[in-house]
């Protein structure tokens, strides 16, 4: 389980609440800092959605990967609209969870969108996830898995 999210509850775009410990166990986790009102976020999110869907698709063995959206939206309604419109079936920290602000500070988020890929202990694998996905597509995931020390036998 990703220590940085230990004890937290996450939500799906449908509103289902899940325990972070269960949902993130033995997975590479990408914290996605973004907002629906942000043009670059709206531009990158469909690409992230395709990347995510390809990795965790049911057609093959799902990859050990999960995205956790950390909203920079102005309201819970804006966050939910953004999630329903463009997001994949990944998870989110609830809008009213003040921990969103702590994560932004911890990972030094000064601009959005930002995709920070982390190890189970919360250490950063890369804070350039967005750039890596744009430049390398699915190929970057294997590097993340190796750096994360989870499921070393994953074959992308």
From Swiss-Prot:
UniProt xrefs under SUPFAM superfamilies: Thioredoxin-like
Gene deletion effect: At 10 months of age, mutant animals show signs of photoreceptor dysfunction. The progressive loss of cone function is followed by cone cell death, while in rods, the outer segment length id reduced, but not rod cell death is not observed. At 12 months, mice present a stronger age-dependent impairment of fine odor discrimination than their wild-type counterparts.
Coiled-coil spans in chain: none
Tissues with expression: Both isoforms are expressed in retina, in the photoreceptor layer, and throughout the olfactory sensory neuron layer of the nasal epithelium, in neurons. Also expressed at low levels in brain and testis.
Domain of life, source organism: Eukaryota
Listed InterPro entries: RdCVF2 (IPR029519), Thioredoxin-like_fold (IPR012336), Thioredoxin-like_sf (IPR036249)
Classification via Gene3D superfamilies: Glutaredoxin (3.40.30.10)
Pfam families (alphabetical): Thioredoxin_8
Disulfide bonds: none
GO BP term, example: sensory perception of smell
Stretches assigned to the Thioredoxin domain: 9-147
Function: May be involved in the maintenance of both the function and the viability of sensory neurons, including photoreceptors and olfactory neurons. In the retina, isoform 1 may be required for rod function and isoform 2 for cone viability and function.
PANTHER family reported in the protein's UniProt record: NUCLEOREDOXIN-LIKE PROTEIN 2 (PTHR46762:SF1)
Protein name per its UniProtKB record: Nucleoredoxin-like protein 2
Gene that produces this protein: Nxnl2
């Amino acid at each position: 389980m990703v220590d940085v999210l230990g004890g937290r509850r996450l939500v799906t775009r449908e509103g289902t609440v899940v325990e972070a410990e269960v949902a993130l166990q033995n997975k590479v986790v990408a914290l996605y800092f973004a907002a629906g009102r942000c043009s670059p976020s709206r531009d990158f999110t469909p690409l992230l959605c395709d990347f995510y869907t390809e990795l965790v698709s049911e057609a093959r063995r799902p990859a050990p990967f999960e995205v956790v959206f950390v909203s920079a939206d102005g309201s819970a309604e804006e966050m939910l609209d953004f999630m329903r419109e463009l997001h994949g079936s990944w998870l989110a920290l609830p809008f009213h969870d003040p921990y969103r602000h702590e994560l932004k500070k911890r990972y030094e988020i000064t601009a959005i969108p930002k995709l920070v890929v982390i190890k189970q202990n919360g250490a950063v694998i890369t804070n350039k996830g967005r750039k890596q996905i744009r430049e390398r597509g699915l190929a970057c995931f294997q590097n993340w898995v190796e750096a994360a020390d989870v499921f070393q036998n994953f074959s992308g």
